[in-house]
Swiss-Prot record:
Gene name of this polypeptide: rpo10
GO cellular component: cytoplasm; DNA-directed RNA polymerase complex
UniProt protein name: DNA-directed RNA polymerase subunit Rpo10
GO molecular function: DNA binding; DNA-directed RNA polymerase activity; zinc ion binding
Organism in which the protein naturally occurs: Methanospirillum hungatei JF-1 (strain ATCC 27890 / DSM 864 / NBRC 100397 / JF-1)
SUPFAM superfamilies, per the entry: RNA polymerase subunit RPB10 (SSF46924)
Cofactor note: Binds 1 zinc ion.
GO terms under biological process: DNA-templated transcription
InterPro entries xrefs: RNA_pol_su_RPB10, RNA_pol_suN_Zn-BS, RPABC5/Rpb10
Subunit record text: Part of the RNA polymerase complex.
Catalytic activity: RNA(n) + a ribonucleoside 5'-triphosphate = RNA(n+1) + diphosphate
Residues that bind Zn(2+): 6, 9, 43-44
Family: Belongs to the archaeal Rpo10/eukaryotic RPB10 RNA polymerase subunit family.
UniProt-annotated location(s): Cytoplasm
PANTHER family, per database record: DNA-DIRECTED RNA POLYMERASES I, II, AND III SUBUNIT RPABC5, DNA-DIRECTED RNA POLYMERASES I, II, AND III SUBUNIT RPABC5 FAMILY MEMBER
């Protein structure tokens, strides 16, 4: 489950997650990706950098 807003400042970050994930999987530098996406605040950067997808692990327990 992708976080919709930054927990600290409330900025919408879900719009940047898919592109961040795609570019990170292509081995691009996370700093450059976040700079290009306009994620200037360190709290928002933290939200994207530390997010871990666990939805596939939770599906069997529905």
């Amino acid at each position: 489950m992708i976080p919709v807003r930054c927990f600290t400042c409330g900025k919408v970050i879900s719009t940047a997650y898919e592109e961040f994930k795609r570019r990170r999987d292509a081995s691009e530098d996370p700093k450059r990706i976040l700079d290009d996406l306009g994620m200037d605040r360190y709290c928002c950067r933290r939200m994207l950098l530390t997010h871990k997808e666990i939805i596939d692990e939770l599906n069997p327990y529905q």
